[in-house]
Amino acid sequence: MYRLIYAFFYTLSLLPMWCLYRLSDMGFVLIYYILRYRRNVVKSNLTSSFPEKSQEELKAIERKFYRWFADYFIESVKLLSISKEELSKRLTIINANHIEECFKEGQDCAGILGHYCNWEWLSCIGISLPSDRKIGLIYKPIRNKTIDKLFYQLRSCVGGVPVPKNEILRYLVQYRKEGVRSLFGYISDQSPRWQNIHLWLPFLNHETPVFTGTERIMRKMNNAVYYVEMNRPKRGYYTCEFHLITKDPQSMPEHEITRQFFKMLEQSIKNQPHLYLWTHKRWKRTKEEFDSRFIIENGKVVPK
């Protein structure tokens, strides 16, 4: 089954971008008007995140989001066959020299990012760095094994190293032992399970539960930490810029890296709100319900 699915998407990826975007236009009509894919969730998220905006403004953001969402899928499929030359034209790394400077100083780097713009393309930022550097993206495996394998393939097509989130420490330690410099991206805006909630932060007009494990890894490995900001100046073209949070994570107050990341991500989203992934129930767990059901004892979340 996987071979058939891969063959289909690989063949699809061979089409030129202008042709793929025509397919994306049709995909937008399908998911927005016909399937109405998670439109209630998207509308609810936008309304609660931007109470200051009018219904007309929210509707415009919603439509632009679904157009981008269709593009996201097509652009991700394109990674299966895109050449490094074309990718270099479409993905501009603004300040990769900052990362290379850290590498030359003997320090590995960590990039922290959200589900904003086309994060799949970030596995390709190694095109702007020497080939002996390891560049990768930590991901949560998809339950459907066939789809998971397909995404693993597209994330590794241009030299990226996809790593399941539960295995990242093993990879980091191994690369360090081998003297290989690495930059890994951590998508850190997911909603944690109840038992993993140790911090709530204001984010997009919500009291939001956030993961703290990413920060613990960065402290343990003493990585230089950057917020990775993508932008989309026009269709099919992205920029990537690294914003330094700290080169000395162990000296920062607990959770400060996480706090700064969410402030930066929120500002990016406010600049171009249609480029955030609004289809997930990001705020399904509330602080009120958490306080009524759980307490924290010795650093662990336990039922009352």
What kind of feature is each model-predicted range?
Residues 40, 120, 148-149, 170, ...:
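Residue-level marker for well-ordered alpha-helical positions
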Residues 53, 60-63, 128, 132, ...:
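Non-catalytic C-terminal accessory region of glycerolipid acyltransferases
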Residues 105-166, 193-202:
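Catalytic core of membrane glycerolipid acyltransferases/transacylases, capturing the structured
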Residues 85, 92, 96-98, 121, ...:
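Short capping/connector residues at structural and topological boundaries
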Residues 100, 124, 215-216:
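Alpha-helical segments flanking ligand/cofactor-binding loops in enzyme cores
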